[in-house]
């Protein structure tokens, strides 16, 4: 299996270095490894068989990986397989007053450490507020800049029917937004302005 990066799914305005698209490709690869094991196949992953793309260019059309499947009865299955269809993005409000303990954080980062990656936790209230401020500022820039907002608007999925039909994109499950859209009171392509109802929503 040769996995290539779909040029039609690139986001040059909001993902200019292809970080998100490559994360998505990586997720597919890992799912393929897990599913292959479930079916009794060992999946060998050969990353970037034609060479890694230029870091300053979007990876459209690039071969991201070659997957070689070999029947292997000794391949161990992964308990995560049964959870794949249950995965979803948690968009609930998080309680930032709760602090993750050192032992909890250690167990969360253990898989990353196995691959030589490092991670850290932001638990101090002052540091949390700094991260929030950066996030708010970044969000405002993306929402109030026409070229970045409109790129995202084309990927908005409003209400249950759109979210079910299109399994990609930016889902907006809010009942209020769905109702306003149904009655023609919410235009996803209207560029928000600071203080406007669209920006507030």
List PLM regions with ranges.
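Acidic, surface-exposed loops and disordered segments
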Residues: 1-201
């Amino acid at each position: 299996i040769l996995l290539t990066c779909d040029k039609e799914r690139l986001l040059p305005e909001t993902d200019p270095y292809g970080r998100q698209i490559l994360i998505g490709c990586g997720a597919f690869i890992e799912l393929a490894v897990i599913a292959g094991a479930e079916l009794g196949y060992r999946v060998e992953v050969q990353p970037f068989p034609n060479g890694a793309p230029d870091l300053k260019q979007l990876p459209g059309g690039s071969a991201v990986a070659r997957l070689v499947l070999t029947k292997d009865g000794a391949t161990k299955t992964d308990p995560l397989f049964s959870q794949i269809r249950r995965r979803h993005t948690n968009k609930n409000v998080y309680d930032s007053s709760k602090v993750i303990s050192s032992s909890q954080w250690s167990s969360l980062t253990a898989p990353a450490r196995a691959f030589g990656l490092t991670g850290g936790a932001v638990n101090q209230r002052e540091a949390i507020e700094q991260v929030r401020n950066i996030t708010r500022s970044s969000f405002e820039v993306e929402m109030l800049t026409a070229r970045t907002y409109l790129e995202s608007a084309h990927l908005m999925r409003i209400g249950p029917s759109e979210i079910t039909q299109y399994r990609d994109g930016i889902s907006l499950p809010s009942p209020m937004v769905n109702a306003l859209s149904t009655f023609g009171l919410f235009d996803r392509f209207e560029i928000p302005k600071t203080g406007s109802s669209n920006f507030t929503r």
